[in-house]
Amino acid sequence: YIFSGSALNQPAVASTSDIINGTGAQAGLTQIINERQQADLGATGMGRLSVSTSGSTVTLNQDGTPFGFQLTGVTSGLNGATVTGPSGSPPTISMALGSNPNDGDTISFQLTLPDGSTQTIALQATSSATPGNGQFSIGATQSATATNLQNALTSAITNLAQTTLPAASAMEAGNNFFSDPPQIVVPGAGNNYATATSLTNGTAANTVIWYTGEDSATPARQTQSAVVAPSTTIDYGMRANETAITNLIKNTAVLAATSYLPTNSNAQATYQALSQKLEGNLSPPSGTQTIADIESDIANAQTTVTNATKLNTQTQTTLSDILNNVDGVNQTQVGEQILTLQNSLSASMSVTARLAQLSLVNYLAPVSG
């Protein structure tokens, strides 16, 4: 199991079935997505937002939980309107119509979705009594116009909550499930996820822990090493929970775990939104580990192995040549050389012996009397 770090005999991940469907009391990704979608949609089906009107003032409210849409901005081009927010806790946006807007005036609301993506709802004032999509009618009074604006904003939010929001919820549920530890929704009263207000850490008792390999503080590459030459060691370990690999598994799992009922008229729009998000995730943000980074690390190790193999081959060839020179000596020729050397040595030793017997007295003449 090469993606298990140092635990080569241990599977790197839980089974596909367990990850997607769960097992026993352990929730799989499908359940985590379903619970997150309920929590983000909310009890009213408006993604945890609400719109109210008082006289000629329209107020857009966020419920203050970590679920659903988050109000992040508003841009107004409505004539005579005083627009403030988002401000307060929980955030609200207030639109006070001091006079009726002009035909064609617009107002835009910026929303952040659970997965961190953003959406803009743009509404345009129209003098027509039958406004089109993304429009609201200018009434006879500011109060009537405010009611029309409320209705148009409510419709736009509801449509977004039924189409794009479920896709964002699925993506964020994937982030929750594949985090360490996993994050799960705490249901509201009566086990109602639509009224949930918080997340908590999942455990092995209630959530499938998808990564089952070794997970120490040691860098992944250093979990497996090999000596390929004297003073040369390569690192080639890998873990399935590395950022790039996790991202790939997560996106694939989210697509596999997301299903749509035939009776859901918004299924196609939701699927398209999810597909766009998954496609965008194929290009991670700058500075984030990619599959190419891991490939580069392994390729560098492979290059080191290749170079070491060449060096080892050259060394083996040299040693083989030396061994062949030793093993390939002509024994007859060596014998003749040894005999010649022995004869020379014997002659030398004979001369040396004779020289050792010489004495000065042998060369002195007798002294006459």
Which residues does each PLM region occupy?
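Extended, beta-strand-rich, solvent-exposed assembly scaffolds of outer structural proteins
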Residues: 47-203, 209-212
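Amphipathic alpha-helical polymerization modules
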Residues: 1-17, 144, 158, 257-369
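Amphipathic heptad-repeat coiled-coil/leucine-zipper-like oligomerization helices
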Residues: 1-77
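Extracellular structured ligand-interaction cores
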Residues: 104-106, 221-223, 233
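Polar, low-complexity tracts enriched in small residues
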Residues: 119-149, 153, 160, 226-306
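Short acidic, Pro/Gly- and aromatic-enriched capping/linker segments at domain boundaries
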Residues: 207-228
